[in-house]
Amino acid sequence: IIPENYQKKTISKEITIDKEPDWINEQFDIHEYLLIVDGYQFNSSYQKRIKEKGFKLIYIDDLASEYMFADIIINHSPNISSENFSCAANTKFALGTKYALLRPTFLELLKKENTLKRRDTAFVCFGGADPFDLTLKVTKALLNITQVKKINIVLGGAYVHKEIYSISQKNIKIFQNLSEKELSEIMRDSSFAIAPASTILYELCCIKIPILSGFYVDNQEAIYNGFADENAIFEMGNIKDFDVASFEAQLHLFFNSDFKELMNSQNKIFDKKIKERYNKLILSIC
């Protein structure tokens, strides 16, 4: 995940989250470094202590639940606004898809068109641990769809289920631990996708292919609703309790729908100035 040319310093496991602000203060000069943090453990108390040390702080958020002490709050959910937050008066906001958190490869792909005409190759990715093994259920459903000739499955690093390997066939390819370039190539080799409303959805929209999407945890629902409002996805709703038949029914509806409108909507979600916008934002607090 971390590019090889980046400098890296690892926090010892002995340093608890309560001790972390002190450790950071000892390791880094507040005049040379700013902090960008992403995780539920970086709560209001943590942010307050970091700010008391004198650091500039950027917090990547997806819940808008706690009081924020950060200098900048990033939340790329489509429908989010500053009114959703409780924060310090001088806090700046980077909200919505104008500040989509996209990796460099996908920022470049925004500039390209996808000319694929066929709709026979599925891309499946539920990321992380996939606790409900939606990957397996979707794959079984896809095997029952005559239009589907090939299935590309990308598993998250924490995926531990085994049955998916037992149904592997010559038209099913399973991938794991991919670089962003490898992931983008598999996406571009696919002609439609099934994925949750998480970061993977943003990256798929950069590829510009039809996407069946849903949510299965709370922090995905706002993103899902935003993309649904933009008519950028085929909507499956809450998929937490879906079984194979549920996914198969959605796939039949999908293949009878108009893909063009979805892809036209995807083209409008992101612009080509995201990187420039972030550079300007970060410089504003330096």
Which ranges hold each PLM region?
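Catalytic binding pocket for nucleotide-activated donors in carbohydrate/polymer assembly enzymes
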Residues: 201-246
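A nucleotide-sugar donor-handling region in carbohydrate enzymes
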Residues: 70-132, 161
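C-terminal alpha-helical cap of glycosyltransferases
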Residues: 271-286
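Short acidic active-site motifs
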Residues: 19-23, 45, 163, 181-185, ...
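Acidic donor-binding loop of glycosyltransferase active sites
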Residues: 188-199, 209
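Conserved donor-nucleotide binding/catalytic region of nucleotide-linked donor-dependent transferases
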Residues: 234, 239-269
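Active-site and donor-binding regions of nucleotide-sugar-utilizing enzymes
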Residues: 2-88, 93
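Donor-nucleotide binding loops and adjacent catalytic segments primarily
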Residues: 117-189
